[in-house]
């Protein structure tokens, strides 16, 4: 009786390392060699001995029963049968025992010579083609030239050359082949993986490393330098693995065989078998290996052997990675077999299918229905479902109460649903919440805990206020129920996940459980006032009196009445008289007293604000009760009010016909202008679109006005829209105004959707004509198709965001940084997009904030800016506040609480362990689906905004201009602006506070001067919204250069007018560029303008021009449908840090513009700084220039049209600018959709994109040039060599060598020793630290380059990540969330924070007793022990 070894893996490991497996390790983990390709005997269904399923190697098929049946039952456990050699043990060992195959010849591992970068190739310095030739037995490679003439190491020989060489050497040096391999004279050349093995054995990593470093530092050729750096990275990874990895292990002599239960073979009926692909692949390897063994034994000729060896190499290749090969092994029905690599990769692979997403027990799913009578924290659970979910708990109670004796009989009782179990179930469910989840779970509110109530039926009941968070409706949605089992899980569900605790949305801190639809409608209806109804103007002593009057029918629910009510003012309770209505009194019965008296019409917005203030003032529990109360009131009143609508409620305004007539007249006028040749074709199109947009807008306004006055504002359709219950202005406009302009179907490849210039004049009430209907269908279908496509995109975006940020956890209270972000309010022209209050609320200030007028300290440095303080700052003249931000946080791991600020879901400062990274990713990803789904309903209506053409002052104030150049126009009072970057500010005359900022477009007419006072409503500037123009800055005669017909311009005669005009085209002759010059009487050139492509030249050669006259018009392409395409793709483009398709060329320095020569269709532009520095840029002629000669530009100004690339911003303006740019640009996309997301979420993601730096000069550190590393790693490495010395000349020292880095102390000791012996001392220089430049990575790159290889491998490119990690011998310290989920550990965040593991909770007395015992144990009689403070908690 022999016993076998047991090696169990502990589950409490804290780090995991991946390395190459050595042959010894594979053998150590193996339980025996697989010798035969047989699997199981098809008659007895028993595994064949020594085959792929052999019981002797892998363990018994049945629990505690050996193959031959000699030993059965558990009492023989651990015995190895003497007849069949099978160990008697449980059958689950077949899931963990490995076998192995001994290969007759070594085989190269496909991962290391087929994937890029080619590891074996880089180590040996061989290109992939040559490597393949050696491995697949086509060429011999010289391993040691020995005495052979004209050959060096790594030369390739064909078979003839090899044999000739052998003969030649045999002639010249007899017996050379009989020498030992170690003899340097012996000529050795080999073929196949064996040759590679020998070469790898001979590799000396250190010397290669020195040689390559030298080459990288000294080589002039950029290409050779890059090549050296690439090889160096592979060499350094082997060196970094500290001897754990040997290069020759990339060639395998032994192959592991994975346990049989992981590659099962299942008999189907009809005598056939379903098998895992791996079995086929293993069989091919074994068959070929055995055949090769036999061929070698019978001494077959070399040709046959070589063919068999090549086939073995290919068989092993396809076992490890079948998808890499061009000729993948196919199964019977022509599908490639799934190899080991394929079983890790992709959505169905091991990582994503089994390790990150497991199916769980104790779960159920069913359809949901509404449960209006539930409380906020409850849900209705069908009886049958509950009985099944809580089964073990019921069984336990049944046995405890003595109703049954055994578990089996208890089970039967539960399955039969005997009445006795229901009250036990009720008892068990108390205080045992369930988790409800609705797929897709886009943010953390997609899973919430509820206290279940037993209900009849088979559907789950859901509280109507939780719907928003789950994004659920009751049209057949299904939800899953999960049961938390352990006490810890139950506690967390109750304290953290209960629905009544999740009232605020983590994305923006606004309440998410806001009444919607019926509830809003009911509340709106009873709080709306209706004058001249029964009881209007009555005065009551108190709410009770008013309610009695209403119940007696003396006063109408909407009648405006006066009542004495209790109200809060500055925290004081006061009684005062308000004008209100009975309906509002009803609502106020439920509003907590501290909030005060709510006296307004309750729409959705108002309700959200009230709920927000209830949470702030009264806390969560009160809010939950308040929500339930107003929910009941809302439903009841919607039912009492009978608020449905009929066809007559959809009013069509009488002015419609007249407005449409006006539209037609205006369009006719435009057509006339066009046929007279006053305007171009594009202008005509733009103006027509504009006209109809205006008409539509006016019609909407008339319509809303009429609806709101219909029936005293109690028109049902209007009430639904106004309260925010259902429908929008857009939709009502289509019901009873006109459908308006529609987008044209897009030809594939054509530019964005044009707009059809004939609008749909009918509305849905009148009905559409056939043509109108047909035009509409396109939009409707496009909407649906877009939705389907973009949902997938949004999901993928969320996944990438989570992957890049999952390890951002709050790890400490304060990182102690002194840096911050300067925050101001965000304006677009005039409108405040985000106020200072919003942007600083809940953040931490870097410095003391002092009130500029009173000198009081509003907020101290390092304190949270609360609502009150933020309001004071907003009202004061302070324009910018420096706040702490994750972007500037200096924590090594994760971020600190101070830099993050307030947790938006709780309205308190964030706690340690909060997973802010995942919350940020979810907050950004969740509305992503809305960004895409917004093409809904309003089928493709061109939401075109009517363009404005002038700027009216909205304030009284003083004008200030920055960088203004303007010219006076003869005979006119206005000036024309000729500078590009002009800013106009309106300042308050008394305080000097800036009221408004505007950018002035080039070519605008300016009616005021610097320092003028303007009144509200004054027109300051006016411009042409449809054309960009070029304006003459001087008076003179016009002369054109390079304006040649059909080369640089073409005459286009208008189809309708026959008038001709010059349009500049892309020059066919690349040396010519069109210019307009202005010359004075003497023929001297005054000004030179370059003419961009597509410009319409208004003047002719030789015309006299006045100052400020328009020379050229460049039609702007207005009239593109504002579709969503900006939406998701733009967000992706920004987060991936991609360069836009036509990037702008940006000036890198401040300076003056000069035009240079033309080169190959590019115009050369120089920027010369005041210090004489000059930069040259080549700009394609097809691009429009945004600058003219002699303009002064600042660094970062675009010189040509197009979007600015983030990389340019980083290079020119630095990291802070690029971070702000990305955050603001992404915010713009979301704002356009009306989605509010707090800045800090974007900052977390951008922080992750900016973690890495690129080494510019490695100095004396371990880094390589161009290597991408973590910021903190560079700092650590620089600290390590700080103050150390590099040996230049070792002198007579025995210990030190040149190039070695030593500490000053060691050097001092060594030199003093040498001095004593009068020997030559060591010469040194200071060690140089590395310099690095910040880089910006897209989220995919950043996610693939995280420290954790497990996280990266489970994200994308699994095999590449794993094989690079294996070579470096990488260690994963399990710091992020994904790695821990994969290992089956608690995540190191929230309640799983590693610091909490060691906490012991005990009673105070026990604590004191324990410490006293410890003291007496430790105390030494002489010294008095120091007193230990007991914690105060």
Swiss-Prot record:
InterPro entries: DNA-dir_RpoC_beta_prime, DNA-dir_RpoC_beta_prime_bact, RNA_pol_asu, RNA_pol_N, RNA_pol_Rpb1_1, RNA_pol_Rpb1_3, RNA_pol_Rpb1_3_sf, RNA_pol_Rpb1_4. Binds 1 Mg(2+) ion per subunit. One of its GO terms (cellular component) is DNA-directed RNA polymerase complex. Keywords: DNA-directed RNA polymerase, Magnesium, Metal-binding, Nucleotidyltransferase, Transcription, Transferase, Zinc. It holds the Pfam family RNA_pol_Rpb1_2. Transmembrane segments: none annotated. GO terms for molecular function: DNA binding; DNA-directed RNA polymerase activity; magnesium ion binding; zinc ion binding. Its cofactor is Mg(2+); Zn(2+). Zn(2+) 2 binds at residues 815, 889, 896, 899. Mg(2+) binds at residues 473, 475, 477. NCBIfam families: rpoC_TIGR. Belongs to the RNA polymerase beta' chain family. PANTHER family: DNA-DIRECTED RNA POLYMERASE (PTHR19376), DNA-DIRECTED RNA POLYMERASE SUBUNIT BETA (PTHR19376:SF54). This is DNA-directed RNA polymerase subunit beta'. It comes from Porphyromonas gingivalis (strain ATCC BAA-308 / W83).
